């Protein structure tokens, strides 16, 4: 079976790897000169198998109003003329109930938990190195209210058998001794010992090398222009003015997936959530994080690589704007100075931004479509690195006609489609 994958971020490359392992003839096409040069380039670096939660949560609408007036708000909304932004925000608000939050979080934990097992198996099989650590995540709560609100998340963790530990303020420094040098006061913490860390770009580029050795063809620097279709099938992809064909097609274009699908009559509610990161050279390892520390107040993660600290987070709903906002850099610097002062050289930090492809319910879109030979793997939001291996393996099983190892409920695009829109779009005569 010949498979054409559109997109060479971590989602596209893991899809290629697992499809190649299943015996498919795989080609990956991307506009960039190498893999992982967009959203996968400098994300927060956390493999948050336990800390997997949708942004759409009870209380978020009220918090969003308050955040409008805060200098270091984790979420900001900049209205655009794109009606899809309004539609996406409306759908997100409808998912901010306790009932929907529980359903969405359970779906996300299902995929994340599976992805941990897939990544561990991949590491054992290939020995792939990506500055990874397996030392857990420590989620910091600055207030008792935050600690109390974590009860619902803990209930879902217990339901899925995800190990966790509640830490008192005195216990936190046992796992992250560098925090002792900061002046921040904490009410407590939630520790997730099975979470991991690693450089997503390194992982993706090294897996692309392994995939190439396994027979996958990567074609970089090529523009994906449109999908051609007829009779409920994709008949080809226009790439740099030429029509390329395959037996099956995988769309893994992140935030740009929705635009490509419009010509097919499919309205995919995937919208870019703009995030920021700083990559900071370590100057004092004793004052740097040991693994990943997540600051619940600012929704910012601080992750340890070999000789660097990656500080990432925040979400701007601002369309496809890729400009670097100095106010966001100030927030990242404020948090790292508060928690790990003196650990890294901020003057030498690399400031970066990327667009996370987010669904309004937080769950990715992985699986079949109304077009028989078109499959999607997108919409992972802030958790693409976390869910990449699980999503790639899950998709490969579906495309091969094998029963996936996890429940398929609620993971594909059909949860968003009305009965009318399930019928393939007909091209104008």
Swiss-Prot record:
Species: Xanthomonas axonopodis pv. citri (strain 306)
Q: Which gene encodes it?
A: dadA
What's the stated role of this polypeptide? Oxidative deamination of D-amino acids.
Q: Which reaction does it catalyse?
A: a D-alpha-amino acid + A + H2O = a 2-oxocarboxylate + AH2 + NH4(+)
UniProt keyword Cell cycle, yes or no: no
Q: Which UniProt keywords apply?
A: FAD, Flavoprotein, Oxidoreductase
Q: Which residues bind FAD per the record?
A: 3-17
Q: Name one Pfam family in it.
A: DAO
| Enzyme Commission no | 1.4.99.-
**Required co-factors:** FAD
Which cellular components does GO assign to this protein?
A: cytoplasm; plasma membrane
Superkingdom is Bacteria
The record's listing under InterPro entries reads: DadA, FAD-dep_OxRdtase, FAD/NAD-bd_sf
Which Gene3D superfamilies has this protein been placed in? Answer: D-Amino Acid Oxidase, subunit A, domain 2 (3.30.9.10), FAD/NAD(P)-binding domain (3.50.50.60)
- Name it: D-amino acid dehydrogenase
What general EC class does the enzyme of this chain belong to? oxidoreductase
Q: Which GO terms describe its molecular function?
A: D-amino-acid dehydrogenase activity
Flavoprotein keyword on record: yes
Q: Which GO terms describe its biological process?
A: D-alanine catabolic process
The record's similarity note reads: Belongs to the DadA oxidoreductase family.
């Amino acid at each position: 079976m010949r498979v054409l994958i559109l997109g060479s971020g971590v989602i596209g490359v893991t899809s290629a790897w697992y499809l190649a392992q299943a015996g498919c003839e795989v080609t990956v096409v991307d506009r960039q000169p190498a893999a992982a040069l967009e959203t996968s380039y400098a994300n927060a670096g956390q493999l948050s198998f336990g800390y997997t939660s949708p942004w759409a949560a009870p209380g978020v609408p009220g918090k969003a109003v308050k955040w409008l007036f805060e200098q270091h708000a984790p979420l900001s909304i900049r209205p655009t003329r794109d009606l899809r932004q309004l539609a996406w925000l409306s759908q997100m608000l409808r998912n901010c109930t306790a009932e929907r939050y529980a359903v969405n979080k359970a779906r996300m934990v299902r995929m994340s938990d599976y992805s941990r097992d897939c990544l561990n198996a991949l590491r054992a099989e290939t020995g792939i190195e990506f500055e990874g650590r397996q030392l857990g995540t420590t989620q910091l709560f600055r207030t008792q209210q935050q600690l109390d609100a974590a009860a619902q998340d803990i209930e879902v963790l217990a339901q899925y058998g995800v190990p966790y530990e509640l830490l008192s303020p005195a216990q936190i420094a046992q796992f992250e001794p560098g925090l002792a040098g900061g002046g921040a006061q904490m009410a407590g913490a939630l520790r997730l010992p099975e979470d991991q860390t690693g450089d997503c770009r390194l992982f993706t580029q090294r897996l692309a090398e392994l995939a190439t050795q396994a027979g996958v063809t990567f074609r970089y620097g090529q523009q994906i222009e449109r999908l051609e279709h007829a009779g409920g099938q994709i008949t080809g992809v226009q790439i740099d003015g030429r029509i390329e064909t395959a037996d099956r097609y995988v769309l893994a274009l992140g935030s740009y997936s929705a635009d490509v699908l419009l010509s097919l009559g499919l309205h995919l509610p995937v919208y870019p959530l703009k995030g920021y990161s700083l990559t900071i050279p370590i100057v004092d390892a004793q004052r740097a994080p040991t693994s990943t520390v997540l600051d619940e107040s600012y929704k910012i993660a601080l992750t340890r690589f070999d000789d660097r600290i990656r500080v990432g987070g925040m979400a701007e709903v601002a369309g496809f704007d890729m400009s670097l906002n100095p106010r966001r850099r100030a927030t990242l610097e404020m948090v790292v100075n508060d928690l790990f002062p003196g650990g890294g050289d901020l003057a030498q930090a690399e400031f970066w931004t990327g667009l996370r492809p987010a669904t309004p319910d937080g769950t990715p879109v992985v699986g079949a479509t109304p077009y028989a030979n078109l499959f999607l793997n997108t919409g992972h939001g802030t958790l693409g690195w976390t869910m990449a291996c699980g999503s790639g393996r899950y998709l490969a099983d579906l495309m091969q006609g094998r029963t996936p190892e996890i429940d398929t409920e609620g993971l594909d695009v059909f949860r968003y489609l009305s009965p009318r829109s399930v019928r393939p779009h007909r091209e104008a005569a």
